[in-house]
């Protein structure tokens, strides 16, 4: 029997506590957060204040409550005093949760919107990279082309040098040949009459002019 009586007492106490809490919540539902000056000082505090109603009696009650709050002594039960703090905590938590819920949505939207412009520009860059890769591949596939061009340049330079040396050799040889011919002609002219000498000299002059 003692166990049942204890249970009944706890149930009745719980019901009373629930009623008190519900009454405190109903009172606090109509409160607002406002900036309130503290007494005669210029300090202002942002805290919960009961909503003013048009009725005269309620206005007087609210004025009394406002004076008590300005003095720093709130005429409320511990449950009522704790309930505004709980409401503040709930509001702050709800605001933070709403911000936290909104921030991932914004991040998702930004992540969804950001890849769209990034997909378009890589097309030309891929083309240029492909061209560069093709050029490198061509250079790797045909390494002998550059070597062949270098060999051709070296051969052409060698041919030019050989031609110039041959020309230089031919000029003194031609001069020596002309000198030998003139000496031979002069030797022949010694035993030839003067008329033939004149003809030979004229022919030599013509050959030299040519």
Swiss-Prot record:
Start-end of Basic and acidic residues biased regions: 54-72, 128-145
Stretches assigned to coiled coil: none
Annotated crosslink Glycyl lysine isopeptide (Lys-Gly) (interchain with G-Cter in SUMO2) location: 199
Keywords assigned by UniProt, alphabetized: Isopeptide bond, Phosphoprotein, Ubl conjugation
UniProt region (Disordered), positions on chain: 48-210
Regions of compositional bias (Low complexity) in chain numbering: 151-165
Assigned GO CC terms: chromatin; GBAF complex; nucleoplasm; SWI/SNF complex
Residues annotated as transmembrane: none
Highest taxon of source: Eukaryota
PANTHER family in alphabetical order: B-CELL CLL_LYMPHOMA 7 PROTEIN FAMILY MEMBER A, BCL7 RELATED
Family: Belongs to the BCL7 family.
Protein name, entry field: B-cell CLL/lymphoma 7 protein family member A
Source organism of the structure: Mus musculus
Protein encoded by which gene: Bcl7a
């Amino acid at each position: 029997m003692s166990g049942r009586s204890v249970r009944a007492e706890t149930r009745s106490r719980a019901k009373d506590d629930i009623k008190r809490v519900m009454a405190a919540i109903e009172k606090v539902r109509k409160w607002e957060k406002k900036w309130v000056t503290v007494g005669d000082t210029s300090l202002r505090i942002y805290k919960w204040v009961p909503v003013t109603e048009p009725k005269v009696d309620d206005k007087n009650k609210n004025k009394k409550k406002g004076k008590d709050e300005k003095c720093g002594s709130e005429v409320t039960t511990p449950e009522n005093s704790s309930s505004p703090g709980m409401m503040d905590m709930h509001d702050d938590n709800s605001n933070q949760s709403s911000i936290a819920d909104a921030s991932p949505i914004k991040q998702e939207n930004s992540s969804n919107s950001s890849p769209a412009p990034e997909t378009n520009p890589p097309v030309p860059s891929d083309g240029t990279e492909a061209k560069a890769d093709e050029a490198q591949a061509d250079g790797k596939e045909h390494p002998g082309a550059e070597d062949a061009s270098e060999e051709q340049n070296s051969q052409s330079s060698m041919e030019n040098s050989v031609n110039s040396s041959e020309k230089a050799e031919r000029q003194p040889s031609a001069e020596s040949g002309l000198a030998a011919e003139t000496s031979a002609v002069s030797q022949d002219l010694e035993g030839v009459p003067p008329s033939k000498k004149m003809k030979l000299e004229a022919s030599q002059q013509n050959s030299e002019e040519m």
